UniProtKB/Swiss-Prot annotation:
Biased segments, Basic and acidic residues type: 357-371, 466-476
Organism name: Pongo abelii (Sumatran orangutan)
Compositionally biased spans, kind Low complexity: 477-497
Pfam families: dsrm, DZF_C, DZF_N
Positions of modified residues (Asymmetric dimethylarginine): 612, 617
PROSITE patterns: DS_RBD, DZF
Subunit description: Interacts with EIF2AK2. Associates with microtubules; it is unsure whether such interaction is direct or indirect.
GO biological processes: cell differentiation; spermatogenesis
One GO CC annotation: cytoplasm
Function noted in UniProt: Involved in spermatogenesis and sperm function. Plays a role in regulation of cell growth. Binds to double-stranded DNA and RNA. Binds most efficiently to poly(I:C) RNA than to poly(dI:dC) DNA. Binds also to single-stranded poly(G) RNA. Binds non-specifically to the mRNA PRM1 3'-UTR and adenovirus VA RNA.
Listed InterPro entries: dsRBD_dom, DZF_dom, DZF_dom_C, DZF_dom_N, NT_sf, STRBP_DSRM_1
Record protein name field: Spermatid perinuclear RNA-binding protein
Superkingdom to which the source organism belongs: Eukaryota
Amino acid sequence: MRSIRSFANDDRHVMVKHSTIYPSPEELEAVQNMVSTVECALKHVSDWLDETNKGTKTEGETEVKKDEAGENYSKDQGGRTLCGVMRIGLVAKGLLIKDDMDLELVLMCKDKPTETLLNTVKDNLPIQIQKLTEEKYQVEQCVNEASIIIRNTKEPTLTLKVILTSPLIRDELEKKDGENVSMKDPPDLLDRQKCLNALASLRHAKWFQARANGLKSCVIVLRILRDLCNRVPTWAPLKGWPLELICEKSIGTCNRPLGAGEALRRVMECLASGILLPGGPGLHDPCERDPTDALSYMTIQQKEDITHSAQHALRLSAFGQIYKVLEMDPLPSSKPFQKYSWSVTDKEGAGSSALKRPFEDGLGDDKDPNKKMKRNLRKILDSKAIDLMNALMRLNQIRPGLQYKLLSQSGPVHAPVFTMSVDVDGTTYEASGPSKKTAKLHVAVKVLQAMGYPTGFDADIECMSSDEKSDNESKNETVSSNSSNNTGNSTTETSSTLEVRTQGPILTASGKNPVMELNEKRRGLKYELISETGGSHDKRFVMEVEVDGQKFRGAGPNKKVAKASAALAALEKLFSGPNAANNKKKKIIPQAKGVVNTAVSAAVQAVRGRGRGTLTRGAFVGAAAAPGYIAPGYGTPYGYSTAAPAYGLPKRMVLLPVMKFPTYPVPHYSFF
C-alpha cells in the first residue's frame, strides 16, 4: 500500500491538469449572466401568462355553483401555469469544463406541457430578454426535445437548453393498472420520455448537491474524468450520471479525506476491479424508487473496454506515469536534484564528474561535528513554538488533569479555525488557532498569564533554575533529619522532598552524575523500584538503594531521575561533611573460599605493609611469576613490583599473586 506522501506527485499533476481544463473567469461570468438573465425572463413570461389567462375569463365562468367553484378552486390552487425554473446538469453540479459547457434549465409546468405552451413561451421569451439586457440572444424551439434553445451572439459562445416538464407525467405512470385516468391527454402533448428525463435530471442535481458536493476532491476528479471521456472514445459511454455515481461511491466510502491524486487512483481501482463487467455488483440508481441499474444502456463490449482502459491507467499511475493518463507533460521535481555544481574535467584533462562536493567546502566553521546540531537547536530556541509548548507543560504541572473542550470549528476546509476552552477555578479561558493543538497552546498561554506566571522561554528557564535551588535546599534539610531515624515515615518525607520538578539532569557538587560517583565509591549497588504512582500525565517513581547498611530513597518523574535522587541522597549523607573521611577508609572486600581466599588475604597484607605474605601449600598452586611479570610481595620490598610506576598503585586496587597451574601433556595426532 502506497503511503499518503507518495501521492504528492500525483496531486501536483492532477491539479495542474485541472487548472488547464477549468473555465476562465470570463467564461464563468458569461455563464452566470446568461443563466440569470434567462431565469429572470422566464419569471416575467410566467407573470405574462397568468395575466393573459385572467383576462380571457368569461362572465359565465364567474356564476358557477358554490360546489363547482370549490372543486375548481381545489384543482387550480396550484397557482401559476409555469410553476418555476430550476438548474440541472453541469450548471447545478458545478462540473463545467472548457469546450464542454452545456447549460440546462428545467421549466416546471402545472399541467402537462404541450406544443402550444412551448410556442407561447418561445414567442414571448425574446421580448422579456430585451427588457432585461442589451445583449442579443437567439431563441428557437425544438419540439422533438421538448425544449427551447437559447444562444448568445458574442464570445464565448454558449448554448442554453430550457426543457419543459411536469410532475403529472411521472404521477400518471406510477398509478396502478386498476385505476382509470380521468383526464385525457391533449393531442399536442410533448414527448413523454423527454419530460421524464428532465424530472430525473432534477432529482440527480438535488442528490449530487447533497451527497457529492461536500466530498473533498470529488468535483475535481469528476472534471478530470469528464475531460478523459471527451478525449478518449472508450470512456465516452460512461460520461454523465453513471460517472458521478461511481466517483461518489469510490471517494465517499473512504474513512478520511483524499487528495486529488489519491481520489483519482481510488476511482480507477474501483473501475479496474470489474464492477462494470457482467456478474459484477452493478451500479444502483439511488434516485429511482424501483431497483434500477444505471449502466443498463451500456453494452458488454463497452464495459470491458472501460475496465481494460482503467487497468492500464492504474498501472501507469502505480509506476509514476500519471501524466500519460492525463495527456500532459511530466512536471519537474519539486525538490532540486543537485545541490552543487559538478565539474566535468579533472587535473589530467580526462572527462570525469565529481560526485562529491569539494573537501574545502566543509572547512571553516563546520569543522565541529556538532555544528549542525547546534544550528538546529538555535533554530528551535528562536521559534515561538517552544514558548507555547513550555507554557502547556508548565500549566499541566501546575494544574494536572485539565480538560480542554472544542467549542467550535469555522472557516473553509483548507484554512479551518478551531476554538478551544479550559475551565480553571471556575473561570473559562478561550483561544483559537489553525489546529486543535495550537488552540490548546494559546489557551495555556492565556491561563498562565492570568495566573501571573511568565510564559517566555527565558522566564521558564529562570523559574526552573529557582525550583532546582529550592529542591536542593529541601533535600539537604530532609537528609539531615532522616540520618537519625530510618523509618518508613522518614523515607516517605525524603522521597517527597527529593522530587525533581525540572527536566534538567541531577548533578553533584563536582558536576558528576550521582549514580556514577556513588558507583565509584561503592560498587555493586542495586537500585529497587519501591512504588509507581500518578496518571499517564504525571508519573512518580520511588527508587531505593542500600549503602553500608543504610537505605536511601529518591523520587522523580521517571526511574532515571528517581535513581539519581537516591544516589545523591546517599552521597550527601555518607560522603559529605565529617563522615566523608571515615567512609573513604572503609573497604568492603568480598569473602572468598579455599585457596583463592588465602591468596587474596596474603596479597592484601603485602599491600598494607604488614610483612611478607605467606601462601599456604595447596594443590596446583605455585608462587613463581609468569614470564614478564613479577608477583607482588615476592622478590621486591614492600610488596610492590619493579614494573609499577614511581608514584605507586591506586590505594583501593587489590593485588593478587600470579598463580601458575600445571599444564597436562596434550596428545598430538598426525594423519598421513
